[in-house]
Amino acid sequence: MSNLTVRATSTRQPVGLADAFFDRDAQTLARDLLGKVIRHRVGDLWLSARIIETEAYYCEEKGSHASLGYTEKRKALFLDGGHIYMYYARGGDSLNFSAQGPGNAVLIKSAYPWVDEISGPASLAQMLLNNPDAQGRPRPSQKLCAGQTLLCKALGLKVPVWDAKRFDHEILLVEDTGPAPTHVIQTTRLGIPHGRDEHLMYRFVDAAYAQWCTRNPLRRGQVEGRDYFLL
């Protein structure tokens, strides 16, 4: 599962997904983004993480920001698929991509550090420096991006820089690097207040990485067919 021991052996440049990739239903996009790699260039380094957990949001359901109406701050949600929507959650930055249809989007909930010929050990080392724990110590690599704000901190993504922007493939992109997840878990989203459509199963997790996502949907007490579905 892990690729954290891969050594950098090439100067291949990453190839980002076209904007048209994001112009699809939010749930479809949320599933299809699993296994893709977010890459952010900082100086000479590409900081990279494999998407392992996403959440879909629709304008018409109460759990979404878009359901509160259009504002200048939320305008990216109402733009074409592939626009970046960033906001602050619990004091940290969060990353979303607009999907097909005004107000529909996907939240990148968590990821897993990705090391390959483009993003070598030096890139991982920089991500560890970017996102230490509360005592200033390096986090375990597996937990470095285990949450939406941890992900953005590790990758160095900031609301003022990227909100309402398109991808710039020289600096920030999402790349298809290989096989899609073998199994996907579908379950309810996290942090949705009571009465705000918290029952909707719009959260998707790469089953192979379930233990490293924001909250493991396969933890003790969870029942398949009631609490989650395996796709």
From Swiss-Prot:
Belongs to the DNA glycosylase MPG family. Its EC number is 3.2.2.-. It holds the Pfam family Pur_DNA_glyco. The lineage of its organism: Bacteria, Pseudomonadati, Pseudomonadota, Gammaproteobacteria, Pseudomonadales. NCBIfam families: PRK00802.1-5. GO terms for biological process: base-excision repair. This is Putative 3-methyladenine DNA glycosylase. Keywords: DNA damage, DNA repair, Hydrolase. SUPFAM superfamilies: FMT C-terminal domain-like (SSF50486). It comes from the Bacteria. InterPro entries: Formyl_transferase-like_C_sf, MPG, MPG_sf. One of its GO terms (molecular function) is DNA binding. It comes from Pseudomonas fluorescens (strain Pf0-1).
